[in-house]
Curated annotation (Swiss-Prot):
Role of this protein: This protein binds to 23S rRNA in the presence of protein L20.
Gene Ontology BP term (one): translation
Keywords: Ribonucleoprotein, Ribosomal protein, RNA-binding, rRNA-binding
InterPro entries for the chain: bL21-like, bL21-like_sf, Ribosomal_bL21
Gene field: rplU
Family: Belongs to the bacterial ribosomal protein bL21 family.
Name by which UniProt lists this protein: Large ribosomal subunit protein bL21
Gene Ontology MF: a single term: rRNA binding
Native species: Pelagibacter ubique (strain HTCC1062)
Subunit structure: Part of the 50S ribosomal subunit. Contacts protein L20.
GO cellular component, one term: cytoplasm
Ribonucleoprotein found in the keyword field: yes
Length: 134
């Protein structure tokens, strides 16, 4: 199974095809769009590894944006004792949820590809009810 180490949002992630990942929010991106990551620090599989200095030129990772959202609230509470001085603040960090679809090598060959994601459709069965009459 191939993997790649990508850099986005000031952080580094080890990704595999088909994996769902929560990363820092990507600007100007709408759900159901394709995203390309070109800052690939390394990629490889069980046998070989290709390490860049600092990035591997020509390698890329394609992903699908699943959704944009906000994490849960983190409370910041500051208090100065015996002075009746306190401050309460909250913060919700924004994130993007992505699904890795393809990993490309520096030659442009596809190293690994995720299976097609089929959206489940709701199957509605007709239910008949009998009304009791008096």
């Amino acid at each position: 199974m191939s993997y790649a180490i990508i850099q986005t949002g000031g952080k580094q992630y080890k990704v595999k095809a088909g994996e769902i990942l929560k990363i820092e929010r990507l600007e100007d991106s709408k759900p159901e769009t394709k995203i390309e990551f070109k800052e690939i620090l390394a990629y490889g599989d069980d046998k070989t590894i290709e390490v860049g200095s600092p990035v591997v030129e020509g390698a890329k990772v394609e992903a699908d944006l699943v959704e944009n959202g906000k994490n849960r609230t983190i409370l910041i509470f500051k208090k100065r004792r015996r002075q009746n001085s306190r401050r309460k603040n909250g913060h919700r960090q924004q994130y993007s949820l992505i699904r890795i679809s393809k990993i490309f090598s520096k030659d442009g060959k596809v190293l690994s590809e995720a299976e097609k994601m089929v959206k489940p459709t709701k199957k509605v069965e007709k239910v008949e009810t009998e009304v009791a009459s008096k």
